[in-house]
Amino acid sequence: MARKKIREYDSKRLLKEHLKRLAGIDLQILSAQVTQSTDFTELVNQQPWLSTMKLVVKPDMLFGKRGKSGLVALNLDIAQVKEFVKERLGVEVEMGGCKAPITTFIVEPFVPHDQEYYLSIVSERLGSTISFSECGGIEIEENWDKVKTIFLSTEKPMTPDACAPLIATLPLEARGKIGDFIKGVFAVFQDLDFSFLEMNPFTIVNGEPYPLDMRGELDDTAAFKTSRSKWGNIEFPLPFGRVLSSTEGFIHDLDEKTSASLKFTVLNPKGRIWTMVAGGELENYAEYSGAPNEEEVLQYARVVLDCATADPDGRKRALLIGGGIANFTDVGATFSGIIRALREKESKLKAARMHIYVRRGGPNYQTGLAKMRKLGAELGVPIEVYGPEATMTGICKQAIECVMAAA
């Protein structure tokens, strides 16, 4: 399971749409998203409530504690919202040790309220943990002893009896409405493959539950069965403060288009030990698996090699190719893609004084290793080739010794 955070705007959109479908509960929530490209005149035309109601505006950037950080404005009209956004859009802020500009806001109706409730659902290995409190809001952590929690195993449904411990201390007249709401939210959680969902707080407006602040995470491995029919045009933003380089973005796009797994993250662009499977002065994390075809591996390897050979400084560098023993990835086929890329980058490899260490096992590995040995002699680039008899730690040690040796 890959837990991916989604924006509050999308969390509320999904909840509103599917809570009605699954539980017959029609949430009266409204929200609008504002970015650099937003035309406020057009936005108000599309959502007229923005010009008739008092509003709340806050960043929608996957970080919490917005209220405590002074990033939430309450009881504004649309002109004040526009000014608030203008003053902060693109401005860098620091949250949790990460710095990044604010690029996305959510605008909602201002809802005066007295009571704040807390609700969270977390997917666990054998089921789900559901937590509820009558003391929600920004002080929830200080009142965690008042949170009630149940665990619901995967095979058990959310029945009134299962929900009862969560709402046992509520006034009798509130238990039915809030209990039905919790059961409905849990149905949405399961049906849409949420892995985490939190409302802190939600309140009651005109007798109906109303989420004020919400966070959500989806299991993106469920995209094949839910993305089109249920998630709609969902966005999985990068974590706050994380920006993809052009090379990382290329591999990310390649990964999105294949059933295989292709990952690449630059950790230290000036490092001298580079990997083409799992990250090794280590400069990158890189991984390919799931039987990518030769063309996909070729494109992937080009990116890694361009990064690994950039800005030669006269010092030796090392490239680790391979990894563990493959289960079903055809080593011969994937190595063919890598070999094509190595041939293309021959001059860059030599300029960077690259030493290559290969270790691989699995289907057709003998063919792949034989091709690599032949390539070393043809290119005049040092390539040491090992099969499953060698260890990954062994070639890592060789790579470290190589780059640390005197030039």
From Swiss-Prot:
<keyword id="KW-0963">Cytoplasm</keyword>
<dbReference type="InterPro" id="IPR032263">
    <property type="entry name" value="Citrate-bd"/>
</dbReference>
<comment type="similarity">
    <text>Belongs to the succinate/malate CoA ligase beta subunit family.</text>
</comment>
<comment type="function">
    <text>ATP citrate-lyase is the primary enzyme responsible for the synthesis of cytosolic acetyl-CoA, used for the elongation of fatty acids and biosynthesis of isoprenoids, flavonoids and malonated derivatives. May supply substrate to the cytosolic acetyl-CoA carboxylase, which generates the malonyl-CoA used for the synthesis of a multitude of compounds, including very long chain fatty acids and flavonoids. In contrast to all known animal ACL enzymes having a homomeric structure, plant ACLs are composed of alpha and beta chains.</text>
</comment>
<feature type="binding site">
    <location>
        <position position="329"/>
    </location>
    <ligand>
        <name>citrate</name>
    </ligand>
</feature>
<keyword id="KW-0067">ATP-binding</keyword>
<feature type="binding site">
    <location>
        <position position="327"/>
    </location>
    <ligand>
        <name>citrate</name>
    </ligand>
</feature>
<keyword id="KW-0443">Lipid metabolism</keyword>
<dbReference type="InterPro" id="IPR056749">
    <property type="entry name" value="Citrate_synth_N"/>
</dbReference>
<dbReference type="GO" id="GO:0005829">
    <property type="term" value="C:cytosol"/>
</dbReference>
<dbReference type="Pfam" id="PF16114">
    <property type="entry name" value="Citrate_bind"/>
</dbReference>
<feature type="binding site">
    <location>
        <position position="360"/>
    </location>
    <ligand>
        <name>citrate</name>
    </ligand>
</feature>
<keyword id="KW-0547">Nucleotide-binding</keyword>
<protein>
    <recommendedName>
        <fullName>ATP-citrate synthase subunit alpha chain protein 1</fullName>
        <ecNumber>2.3.3.8</ecNumber>
    </recommendedName>
</protein>
<comment type="subunit">
    <text>Heterooctamer of 4 alpha and 4 beta chains.</text>
</comment>
<dbReference type="Pfam" id="PF24948">
    <property type="entry name" value="Citrate_synth_N"/>
</dbReference>
<dbReference type="GO" id="GO:0005524">
    <property type="term" value="F:ATP binding"/>
</dbReference>
<keyword id="KW-0808">Transferase</keyword>
<dbReference type="InterPro" id="IPR016102">
    <property type="entry name" value="Succinyl-CoA_synth-like"/>
</dbReference>
<keyword id="KW-0012">Acyltransferase</keyword>
<dbReference type="GO" id="GO:0003878">
    <property type="term" value="F:ATP citrate synthase activity"/>
</dbReference>
<keyword id="KW-0444">Lipid biosynthesis</keyword>
<dbReference type="GO" id="GO:0006629">
    <property type="term" value="P:lipid metabolic process"/>
</dbReference>
